[in-house]
Structures are given as structure tokens and as C-alpha cells.
């Protein structure tokens, strides 16, 4: 049976080669006679799996030794609480700043409010004229030179790819140039993690839920500058204290072992595709194909300011919304799955993560073209 093209925003498609290897090793990992799901998290077999996954991730992103790499539980939303519990009080008065560009940065801001004094440094939550064009809320990124970052903040948080609204930062700002040299950047990179090169040293902390580009739901990767950890709030659970997790190499408590194993297979798959530079080239080609067609017709519309359009998550609407149900039914019949947009914005969304080949995007564009011929 042919597998359909899965455009889910997450949990998302995994590389077929990874799924096949996991199936082959399900009952016996590397001659151990055990499934990874049956291993002690402190036994030599899983220690080997976990340490190799960390080594491969460090290699892919060029993570230096003065940064800790941690595999944690709780997902991206959980990390929105774990980050402030670990960092917000590191300079005494608990304070953190946020750049709001969509749903997930807004959720992060709200969650951090439980732990200290939070401040909006910039927001795209209102309509604005950008490059001479009127942009709706959450379809643009405030220029960095307009951000109001407090020099006393413990960190500045941004979501570098908004999964729902389809907005992506093309670069991360230099906070020293904004008058805040002592404020580290915290980046939620969940939905474009490993999709392109990222200079992790530009951030004090980066985190990413695996279920977009790096594996199944259940594990979150955290890359943190070591001098920032060890100052958790007293209320922080010990299992979520970065100092504990880093000291025990992600095995302070029982980790999500199978999810880490799959993530490790994905890391090796990414390396085999040419690393993050190879993934960037492939992802650029896919995005250019899809956006190119959407921009060529008035039948569909992507509302995001072109320079900050996400290569991973492509929201679009049909000009005639009465056709939405017919569009989705036809897409499923054509083997194009999970194209319905998020309930908060409606319309459609095609998530074209690393595991989606160019062939799948071509199939989507052909369907878009055919549907327009029939209903346009």
C-alpha cells in the first residue's frame, strides 16, 4: 500500500528510512536481545544510544563544549514553564522580555507570567504597514531596531518559527546592538529545528520539541549555555532543573528512551542528507515551489509578509471559503493528508518539514492546480 503524503504540523511525518530501521530493530537492538523500550535507562545499551544522539546533535549544530545538550520531557509547552523556572530569577528580580509574533510566542509569554515580571519588547499582534503593504496581525515580524528590551531582563524570548501563523525569523538579533548585552536570547525553534544551519552561540538557550523535524512526540531538545544554568527558582521540580539534567547527561530521572532513540536515528538521517546545509537546500526548493504557485494565482492566498514566510509551515486560504470542505475531501482522496489549518486561523496549512520530499510538494501543487481548474 502506497503511503499518503502527510502534511501534519505535528506530530509530523518521519523519514521512511528511520521508521524502517526502527521496525527492524524493534525486538532486538544491536544484538542485545531487547527492544529499546525494554532497556534500563542506566544500562550500557541505552547510555550508548543517548550519548551517540547527543554527539550527533552537537555535530549537526556545531554545539560547543560550553553549552549543555539535554533531552527533556514536557514538550514545547512544558518548556515554556521550565525555561522561566530555570532562568527568570538568575539576576535576582525575576524578569523576562518577549517578542510576540504569533500563537506560540504568546503562549510562552502567558506561561512565564506565572513566575515573574514579564514585558513585551515587541509585538506583531496588530495590523501594520510593512514595506508599503498592509499586513494583518501575526503575519509580519517587528524590526529588531524597534524592540524595547530591558537591560535588566533575565532573558529575551522569541519563537523563531510560528507553526500556526507561518512566520519565520531569517536571523536572530544581536541583543548587544539593542543595548542589552547582558540579556541572553532564548529561542523556541521547535518547528524549524534542523531545517537549516543555526548558530546556537547567538542564543543563550534554544529548545525544540522533537515532533516536527526531529522525532516523535515525547522528547524536547534543549541546548543551553552552561553559565546560565544552576540558578533555578526554589519551586522548580528537581527533574526539570537544568543543572540536574545536564550533570546526569539527560538521565537524572527515567528519560523518554524510545523517543530519544528515534531522534538519534533522525539525526543520523539528517547527516546522511548533507547535514543542516543539505536540509536547507532541500527545504528552500520545496518552499519556493509551493509559494511560487500560491503567488501565481488569485484563487489561493498566503497572507504572510514574503521576507518572513516560513519554509516549514505554509498557511493559505481559498478565496472562496465555501469550497473548503470540498478541497479537503478531494485532497484526502488524492492521498494528501492533514491539510486543514489550525482552528484559531482556519483555512489550510501545509507543513513541509525535513521528511517531506520534493515529490510530495509537487503532488500538492498539482492538486492545487487541478482543484482550481475544476472550481475556479
Swiss-Prot record:
It catalyses: O-phospho-L-serine + 2-oxoglutarate = 3-phosphooxypyruvate + L-glutamate; 4-(phosphooxy)-L-threonine + 2-oxoglutarate = (R)-3-hydroxy-2-oxo-4-phosphooxybutanoate + L-glutamate. Its cofactor is pyridoxal 5'-phosphate. Pathway: Amino-acid biosynthesis; L-serine biosynthesis; L-serine from 3-phospho-D-glycerate: step 2/3; Cofactor biosynthesis; pyridoxine 5'-phosphate biosynthesis; pyridoxine 5'-phosphate from D-erythrose 4-phosphate: step 3/5. One of its GO terms (biological process) is pyridoxine biosynthetic process. Its main location: cytoplasm. It is an enzyme of class 2 (transferase). It is found in: Cytoplasm. The modification N6-(pyridoxal phosphate)lysine is found at residue 212. L-glutamate binds at residue 42. Binds 1 pyridoxal phosphate per subunit. GO terms for molecular function: O-phospho-L-serine:2-oxoglutarate aminotransferase activity; pyridoxal phosphate binding. GO terms for cellular component: cytoplasm. Homodimer. Belongs to the class-V pyridoxal-phosphate-dependent aminotransferase family. SerC subfamily. NCBIfam families: PRK05355.1, serC_1. This is Phosphoserine aminotransferase.
